[in-house]
Amino acid sequence: MSLEQIIEQAFEKRAEYSPATMPQEVKDAVNSVLDQLDNGSLRVAEKKDGEWIVNQWAKKAVLLSFRLNDNYPMQTGEHVQFYDKVPTKFANWTEQQFVEAGVRVVPPAVARRGSFIAKGVVLMPSYTNIGAYVDEGAMIDTWATVGSCAQIGKNVHLSGGVGIGGVLEPLQANPTIIEDNCFIGARSEIVEGVIVEEGSVISMGVYIGQSTKIYDRETGEITYGRVPAGSVVVSGSLPSKDGSHSLYCAVIVKKVDAQTRSKTSINELLRLA
């Protein structure tokens, strides 16, 4: 059987498995998938012909991985230890591995095994969960979290305290995706498989899930689950039909192209909104 077939069949029986009862074939398959996710040769989601395709079987392998091991003590330095079942990505790395990978990891940043961190990425004190893919040149700023299986594009900036949702808790069908050259403002949350398309700017304190209304100020259109490429987005509200109250929404205040982005600072884009 192929790796995918082993994972698919095992996932149907996942409730039966524990570290003691999981067949060796399944353990080997799950570990193989985790290794490929860790080195970037496999992704939970990838863009093909302009559309994002989710490798659901890879996501299932991530879910199965939590039945591979019991919790065990993990020593970090002389006075700190953790108790978990998933090792950290950099636990046994040598200086040469860091040099070759071209990443910067600022203490106490944590990335779990099975996450991929590409060349030129800076991890400020932040958390990157299993199955996530962080592409070249991205900045994961202080106290930002990259959820399980989330996809972070090239040159993305996740500002301080940003939360990018994962697929594990609660269980989600599709990963959250932030495409290339996006800026996500401080304390914003993008969750539940929402896609923020290339070159978009999300202001500070914007919260977008699948049920969040995304209102385009220019067209009056309301959409869900996807921020169009080049959007500048701020938090706002829309009135109810009877005018008795207003409910939160995300507002697209303008669209910008790559040329405008290259000549204009993020603050200017938001101030001119």
Swiss-Prot record:
<dbReference type="GO" id="GO:0008666">
    <property type="term" value="F:2,3,4,5-tetrahydropyridine-2,6-dicarboxylate N-succinyltransferase activity"/>
</dbReference>
<keyword id="KW-0963">Cytoplasm</keyword>
<dbReference type="InterPro" id="IPR001451">
    <property type="entry name" value="Hexapep"/>
</dbReference>
<comment type="subunit">
    <text>Homotrimer.</text>
</comment>
<keyword id="KW-0012">Acyltransferase</keyword>
<feature type="binding site">
    <location>
        <position position="141"/>
    </location>
    <ligand>
        <name>substrate</name>
    </ligand>
</feature>
<dbReference type="InterPro" id="IPR011004">
    <property type="entry name" value="Trimer_LpxA-like_sf"/>
</dbReference>
<dbReference type="InterPro" id="IPR005664">
    <property type="entry name" value="DapD_Trfase_Hexpep_rpt_fam"/>
</dbReference>
<dbReference type="InterPro" id="IPR037133">
    <property type="entry name" value="THP_succinylTrfase_N_sf"/>
</dbReference>
<keyword id="KW-0028">Amino-acid biosynthesis</keyword>
<comment type="pathway">
    <text>Amino-acid biosynthesis; L-lysine biosynthesis via DAP pathway; LL-2,6-diaminopimelate from (S)-tetrahydrodipicolinate (succinylase route): step 1/3.</text>
</comment>
<protein>
    <recommendedName>
        <fullName>2,3,4,5-tetrahydropyridine-2,6-dicarboxylate N-succinyltransferase</fullName>
        <ecNumber>2.3.1.117</ecNumber>
    </recommendedName>
</protein>
<keyword id="KW-0808">Transferase</keyword>
<dbReference type="GO" id="GO:0005737">
    <property type="term" value="C:cytoplasm"/>
</dbReference>
<keyword id="KW-0677">Repeat</keyword>
<dbReference type="Pfam" id="PF14602">
    <property type="entry name" value="Hexapep_2"/>
</dbReference>
<dbReference type="GO" id="GO:0009089">
    <property type="term" value="P:lysine biosynthetic process via diaminopimelate"/>
</dbReference>
<dbReference type="GO" id="GO:0019877">
    <property type="term" value="P:diaminopimelate biosynthetic process"/>
</dbReference>
<keyword id="KW-0220">Diaminopimelate biosynthesis</keyword>
<keyword id="KW-0457">Lysine biosynthesis</keyword>
<dbReference type="GO" id="GO:0016779">
    <property type="term" value="F:nucleotidyltransferase activity"/>
</dbReference>
<comment type="similarity">
    <text>Belongs to the transferase hexapeptide repeat family.</text>
</comment>
<dbReference type="InterPro" id="IPR018357">
    <property type="entry name" value="Hexapep_transf_CS"/>
</dbReference>
<feature type="binding site">
    <location>
        <position position="104"/>
    </location>
    <ligand>
        <name>substrate</name>
    </ligand>
</feature>
<dbReference type="Pfam" id="PF14805">
    <property type="entry name" value="THDPS_N_2"/>
</dbReference>
<dbReference type="InterPro" id="IPR023180">
    <property type="entry name" value="THP_succinylTrfase_dom1"/>
</dbReference>
